[in-house]
Amino acid sequence: MNNSQQWQAANTARAALYRWFAELFARELTKTNLTQLQAQYPSLHAAFSDLNLEPQSAALQTALENLQVIPAPDRALELAADFAHLFLLSGHQSAPPYASYYLESDQMLYGKPAQQMSEFLASHKLDLHPEFREPKDHLSIYLQVMSLWIKSSVDEQANLIEMAVQQQHFLEDALLSWLPKFAARCQHIRVKTQVYPAIIDLLLHFVQEDRQALEDMAEAE
Protein backbone atom coordinates (compact mmCIF):
# COMPACT_ATOMS: atom_id res chain seq x y z
CA MET A 1 0.00 0.00 0.00
CA ASN A 2 1.51 3.35 -1.06
CA ASN A 3 1.33 6.61 0.89
CA SER A 4 -1.79 7.81 -0.91
CA GLN A 5 -3.63 4.57 -0.22
CA GLN A 6 -2.59 4.66 3.44
CA TRP A 7 -3.77 8.24 3.81
CA GLN A 8 -7.07 7.46 2.10
CA ALA A 9 -7.59 4.61 4.53
CA ALA A 10 -6.79 6.91 7.46
CA ASN A 11 -9.28 9.56 6.38
CA THR A 12 -12.30 7.64 7.66
CA ALA A 13 -10.76 7.55 11.13
CA ARG A 14 -9.76 11.22 10.92
CA ALA A 15 -13.30 12.25 10.04
CA ALA A 16 -14.72 10.19 12.91
CA LEU A 17 -12.31 11.64 15.47
CA TYR A 18 -12.96 15.23 14.43
CA ARG A 19 -16.70 14.53 14.66
CA TRP A 20 -16.21 13.00 18.12
CA PHE A 21 -14.39 16.09 19.37
CA ALA A 22 -16.99 18.38 17.75
CA GLU A 23 -19.80 16.69 19.63
CA LEU A 24 -17.97 16.97 22.96
CA PHE A 25 -17.67 20.74 22.61
CA ALA A 26 -21.13 21.32 21.12
CA ARG A 27 -23.12 20.63 24.28
CA GLU A 28 -22.97 19.14 27.76
CA LEU A 29 -22.75 15.38 28.14
CA THR A 30 -25.98 13.73 29.20
CA LYS A 31 -26.00 10.77 31.55
CA THR A 32 -26.44 8.48 28.53
CA ASN A 33 -23.63 10.21 26.60
CA LEU A 34 -21.30 9.86 29.57
CA THR A 35 -22.07 6.16 29.96
CA GLN A 36 -21.34 5.64 26.25
CA LEU A 37 -18.11 7.62 26.46
CA GLN A 38 -16.85 5.59 29.40
CA ALA A 39 -17.75 2.33 27.64
CA GLN A 40 -16.13 3.23 24.31
CA TYR A 41 -13.03 4.99 25.61
CA PRO A 42 -10.74 1.92 25.83
CA SER A 43 -11.00 1.50 22.05
CA LEU A 44 -10.57 5.24 21.53
CA HIS A 45 -7.51 5.18 23.78
CA ALA A 46 -5.98 2.53 21.53
CA ALA A 47 -6.66 4.70 18.47
CA PHE A 48 -5.14 7.79 20.06
CA SER A 49 -2.13 5.80 21.23
CA ASP A 50 -1.52 4.75 17.62
CA LEU A 51 -1.40 8.46 16.77
CA ASN A 52 1.42 9.13 19.28
CA LEU A 53 -1.06 10.60 21.77
CA GLU A 54 -0.82 7.97 24.49
CA PRO A 55 0.09 10.38 27.36
CA GLN A 56 -2.72 12.81 26.57
CA SER A 57 -5.24 10.02 26.04
CA ALA A 58 -4.17 8.26 29.23
CA ALA A 59 -4.86 11.48 31.15
CA LEU A 60 -8.42 11.51 29.83
CA GLN A 61 -8.85 7.82 30.59
CA THR A 62 -7.73 8.45 34.17
CA ALA A 63 -10.06 11.45 34.49
CA LEU A 64 -12.99 9.31 33.36
CA GLU A 65 -12.05 6.56 35.79
CA ASN A 66 -11.79 9.09 38.63
CA LEU A 67 -15.46 9.97 38.16
CA GLN A 68 -16.18 6.84 40.18
CA VAL A 69 -15.61 8.85 43.38
CA ILE A 70 -18.71 10.91 42.49
CA PRO A 71 -22.11 9.24 43.10
CA ALA A 72 -23.36 7.86 39.78
CA PRO A 73 -26.51 10.04 39.59
CA ASP A 74 -24.37 13.18 40.02
CA ARG A 75 -21.57 12.55 37.52
CA ALA A 76 -23.24 14.07 34.47
CA LEU A 77 -24.38 17.02 36.58
CA GLU A 78 -20.83 17.69 37.77
CA LEU A 79 -19.55 17.55 34.19
CA ALA A 80 -22.32 19.90 33.07
CA ALA A 81 -21.24 22.33 35.78
CA ASP A 82 -17.64 22.07 34.57
CA PHE A 83 -18.80 22.65 30.97
CA ALA A 84 -20.69 25.77 32.02
CA HIS A 85 -17.84 27.08 34.15
CA LEU A 86 -15.31 26.59 31.36
CA PHE A 87 -17.26 27.71 28.32
CA LEU A 88 -20.51 29.50 29.19
CA LEU A 89 -19.66 32.16 31.76
CA SER A 90 -18.50 35.67 30.89
CA GLY A 91 -15.11 35.95 29.22
CA HIS A 92 -13.06 37.00 32.24
CA GLN A 93 -14.36 33.99 34.20
CA SER A 94 -14.21 31.32 31.51
CA ALA A 95 -12.55 30.26 28.26
CA PRO A 96 -15.00 31.18 25.49
CA PRO A 97 -14.75 28.59 22.68
CA TYR A 98 -14.85 31.24 19.93
CA ALA A 99 -11.99 32.24 17.65
CA SER A 100 -13.00 35.92 17.75
CA TYR A 101 -12.34 36.10 21.49
CA TYR A 102 -8.67 35.21 20.96
CA LEU A 103 -8.01 36.85 17.59
CA GLU A 104 -9.93 40.14 17.83
CA SER A 105 -8.44 42.96 19.91
CA ASP A 106 -11.82 43.79 21.47
CA GLN A 107 -12.53 40.10 22.25
CA MET A 108 -16.06 40.55 20.89
CA LEU A 109 -17.96 37.65 19.38
CA TYR A 110 -19.19 37.57 15.77
CA GLY A 111 -15.89 39.09 14.65
CA LYS A 112 -13.89 38.57 11.46
CA PRO A 113 -13.24 34.83 12.13
CA ALA A 114 -17.00 34.19 12.26
CA GLN A 115 -17.46 35.98 8.93
CA GLN A 116 -14.56 34.07 7.37
CA MET A 117 -16.01 30.75 8.52
CA SER A 118 -19.43 31.62 7.07
CA GLU A 119 -17.77 32.34 3.73
CA PHE A 120 -15.73 29.12 3.94
CA LEU A 121 -18.84 27.03 4.62
CA ALA A 122 -20.64 28.59 1.67
CA SER A 123 -17.72 28.19 -0.75
CA HIS A 124 -17.17 24.54 0.19
CA LYS A 125 -20.90 23.72 0.32
CA LEU A 126 -20.60 22.23 3.80
CA ASP A 127 -23.87 21.89 5.73
CA LEU A 128 -23.72 21.94 9.52
CA HIS A 129 -26.30 20.57 11.91
CA PRO A 130 -29.23 23.05 11.69
CA GLU A 131 -29.93 22.89 15.43
CA PHE A 132 -26.45 24.16 16.33
CA ARG A 133 -26.99 27.92 16.43
CA GLU A 134 -23.72 29.15 17.90
CA PRO A 135 -21.62 31.81 16.12
CA LYS A 136 -19.76 30.36 13.17
CA ASP A 137 -16.38 30.67 14.89
CA HIS A 138 -17.34 28.26 17.69
CA LEU A 139 -14.72 25.56 18.22
CA SER A 140 -17.22 22.80 17.51
CA ILE A 141 -17.88 24.24 14.05
CA TYR A 142 -14.19 24.16 13.08
CA LEU A 143 -14.11 20.51 14.12
CA GLN A 144 -17.34 19.72 12.27
CA VAL A 145 -15.89 21.38 9.19
CA MET A 146 -12.82 19.17 9.28
CA SER A 147 -14.95 16.04 9.69
CA LEU A 148 -17.29 16.94 6.82
CA TRP A 149 -14.43 18.11 4.60
CA ILE A 150 -12.47 14.90 5.11
CA LYS A 151 -15.54 12.78 4.46
CA SER A 152 -16.45 14.69 1.29
CA SER A 153 -12.89 14.36 -0.03
CA VAL A 154 -13.13 10.59 0.43
CA ASP A 155 -16.57 10.36 -1.16
CA GLU A 156 -15.50 12.46 -4.14
CA GLN A 157 -12.05 10.81 -4.41
CA ALA A 158 -10.41 14.22 -4.40
CA ASN A 159 -6.75 14.79 -5.19
CA LEU A 160 -5.21 13.70 -1.90
CA ILE A 161 -2.09 15.85 -2.08
CA GLU A 162 -4.01 18.99 -2.95
CA MET A 163 -6.51 18.24 -0.19
CA ALA A 164 -3.73 17.58 2.34
CA VAL A 165 -2.17 20.97 1.59
CA GLN A 166 -5.51 22.76 1.86
CA GLN A 167 -6.39 21.08 5.14
CA GLN A 168 -2.93 21.76 6.55
CA HIS A 169 -3.32 25.46 5.79
CA PHE A 170 -6.83 25.48 7.27
CA LEU A 171 -5.59 23.97 10.52
CA GLU A 172 -2.68 26.42 10.69
CA ASP A 173 -4.61 29.56 9.79
CA ALA A 174 -8.13 28.96 11.09
CA LEU A 175 -7.65 26.73 14.14
CA LEU A 176 -4.09 26.61 15.46
CA SER A 177 -3.94 30.41 15.31
CA TRP A 178 -6.03 30.45 18.52
CA LEU A 179 -6.52 26.90 19.83
CA PRO A 180 -3.30 26.94 21.94
CA LYS A 181 -4.45 30.16 23.66
CA PHE A 182 -7.86 28.63 24.33
CA ALA A 183 -6.30 25.43 25.69
CA ALA A 184 -3.92 27.33 27.96
CA ARG A 185 -6.77 29.45 29.32
CA CYS A 186 -8.82 26.32 30.06
CA GLN A 187 -6.02 24.81 32.13
CA HIS A 188 -6.08 27.79 34.51
CA ILE A 189 -9.80 27.56 35.31
CA ARG A 190 -10.66 25.55 38.39
CA VAL A 191 -13.24 22.83 37.80
CA LYS A 192 -14.50 19.87 39.80
CA THR A 193 -13.19 17.13 37.50
CA GLN A 194 -10.29 16.85 35.07
CA VAL A 195 -12.37 15.44 32.21
CA TYR A 196 -12.70 18.61 30.14
CA PRO A 197 -9.14 19.84 30.77
CA ALA A 198 -7.94 16.42 29.57
CA ILE A 199 -10.21 16.52 26.50
CA ILE A 200 -8.93 19.98 25.60
CA ASP A 201 -5.29 18.96 25.95
CA LEU A 202 -5.93 15.84 23.87
CA LEU A 203 -7.65 17.91 21.18
CA LEU A 204 -4.76 20.37 20.95
CA HIS A 205 -2.20 17.61 20.53
CA PHE A 206 -4.46 15.74 18.09
CA VAL A 207 -4.80 18.79 15.84
CA GLN A 208 -1.06 19.45 16.01
CA GLU A 209 -0.29 15.83 15.10
CA ASP A 210 -2.82 15.90 12.27
CA ARG A 211 -1.33 19.10 10.88
CA GLN A 212 2.11 17.48 10.92
CA ALA A 213 0.78 14.34 9.23
CA LEU A 214 -0.77 16.47 6.49
CA GLU A 215 2.54 18.25 5.94
CA ASP A 216 4.40 14.94 5.83
CA MET A 217 1.85 13.57 3.37
CA ALA A 218 2.30 16.53 1.02
CA GLU A 219 6.09 16.43 1.20
CA ALA A 220 6.28 12.67 0.61
CA GLU A 221 4.83 12.94 -2.89
From Swiss-Prot:
Residue ranges of coiled coil: none
Record has Chaperone as a keyword: yes
GO cellular component terms given for this protein: cytoplasm
Subcellular location: Cytoplasm
UniProt similarity note: Belongs to the TorD/DmsD family. TorD subfamily.
Task performed by this protein: Involved in the biogenesis of TorA. Acts on TorA before the insertion of the molybdenum cofactor and, as a result, probably favors a conformation of the apoenzyme that is competent for acquiring the cofactor.
Protein's name in the database: Chaperone protein TorD
Organism: Psychrobacter sp. (strain PRwf-1)
